[in-house]
């Protein structure tokens, strides 16, 4: 628990990362203000204050009022709806712009924005990973090895998760030399689509572009958080490592493989919540673009969302 309990606003408190972060902060003794269309979905707790508002629809000045009285503001903002149709470029960036302008009117002492892995640099370069031609295929291959990630994708994105499971099955058959012609066709079609345009590419590129609103700015205290590529529900290990600007890749690049193949790292949403909560309390990464990664070897499907009944002692 922080020596001085804080009043932390969380945009998107009932979502994937936001719900875990709210639970982590409440367990540390902080007060959480949930800001979204339906923040009450998270549950009830004496130190949880829901402030319902539709960020996409209200004027900037009205949104700014929701930030009053906060020590820290964290944006875990994401699409409202499920499915691939929610993964859009422009709506996300317009909402980010609105949030930043509202924060300018009513600033907190520290603003943390949770983006995505796509803005992280390919190690040794200034190129964002999302702009590297090999990133998406390596990413899809990596998440297809994880039942936890597939279950998460099915829960959030429907058909995209279902097709990923079928792709996994086909790749397993191929590796065991039992692949049918149908399996081979599934692999070829799936990977062809990724090479043309991955269904999530626009949204991941939006996260990359969002970082440009922060980069090199020192007019307010901010921190831009990019969870590592294989970010998913999983075990809370309580341990993590930090990287600034670069995507962490493990092992050495093989001669016949691209720079990402078999080398992507990840973190559970529970451990990412710990990393963000630690930064809220310690403020070691002000004006930094950073990532966290951890051990995700225990591949067990876990809830994509938690409620306030997960707070120590329940919602009492």
Q: Where are each of the predicted segments found?
A:
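Conserved beta-strand positions in the Rossmann-like core of class I SAM-dependent methyltransferases
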Residues: 9, 33, 223
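NAD(P)H-binding glycine-rich loop region in Rossmannoid oxidoreductase-like domains
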Residues: 34, 39-108
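Glycine-/Pro-rich loop/turn segments that contact NAD(P) or position catalytic residues
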Residues: 81-236, 240
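Mid/C-terminal beta-alpha module of Rossmann-like enzyme folds, strongest
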Residues: 7, 11, 15-16, 257-316
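Rossmann-fold scaffold of SDR-type NAD(P)-dependent oxidoreductases
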Residues: 11, 72-76, 113-114
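N-terminal Rossmann NAD(P)H-binding glycine-rich loop of SDR-like oxidoreductase domains
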Residues: 2-30
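A conserved pocket-lining segment of Rossmann-fold NAD(P)-dependent short-chain dehydrogenase/reductase
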Residues: 195, 241-267
């Amino acid at each position: 628990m922080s020596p001085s309990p804080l009043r932390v606003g969380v945009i998107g408190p009932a979502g994937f990362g936001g719900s875990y972060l709210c639970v982590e902060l409440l367990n540390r003794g902080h007060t959480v203000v949930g800001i979204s269309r339906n923040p009450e979905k998270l549950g009830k707790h004496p130190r949880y204050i829901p402030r319902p508002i539709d960020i996409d629809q209200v004027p900037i000045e009205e949104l700014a009022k929701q930030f009053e009285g906060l020590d820290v503001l964290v944006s875990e903002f994401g699409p409202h709806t499920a499915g691939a149709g929610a993964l859009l470029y422009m709506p996300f960036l317009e909402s980010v712009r609105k949030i930043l302008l509202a924060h300018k009117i009513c600033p907190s002492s520290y603003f943390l924005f949770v983006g995505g892995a796509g803005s992280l640099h390919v190690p040794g370069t200034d190129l964002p990973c999302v702009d590297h031609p090999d990133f998406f295929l390596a990413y899809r291959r990596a998440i297809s090895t994880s039942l936890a990630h597939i279950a998460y994708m099915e829960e959030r994105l429907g058909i995209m998760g279902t097709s990923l499971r079928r792709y996994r099955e086909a790749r397993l058959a191929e590796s065991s030399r039992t692949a049918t012609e149908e399996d081979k066709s599934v692999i070829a079609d799936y990977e062809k689509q990724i090479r043309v345009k991955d269904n999530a590419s626009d949204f991941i590129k939006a996260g990359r572009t969002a970082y440009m609103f922060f980069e090199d700015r020192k007019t307010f205290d901010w921190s831009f958080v990019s969870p590592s590529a294989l970010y998913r529900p999983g075990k809370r290990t309580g341990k993590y490592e930090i990287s600034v600007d670069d995507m962490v890749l493990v092992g050495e690049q093989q001669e016949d493989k691209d720079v990402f193949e078999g080398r992507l790292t990840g973190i559970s949403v529970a451990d990412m919540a710990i990393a963000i909560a630690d930064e809220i309390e310690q403020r070691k990464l002000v004006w930094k673009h950073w990532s966290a990664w951890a051990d995700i070897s225990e591949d067990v499907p876990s809830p994509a969302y938690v409620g306030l009944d997960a707070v120590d002692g329940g919602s009492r």
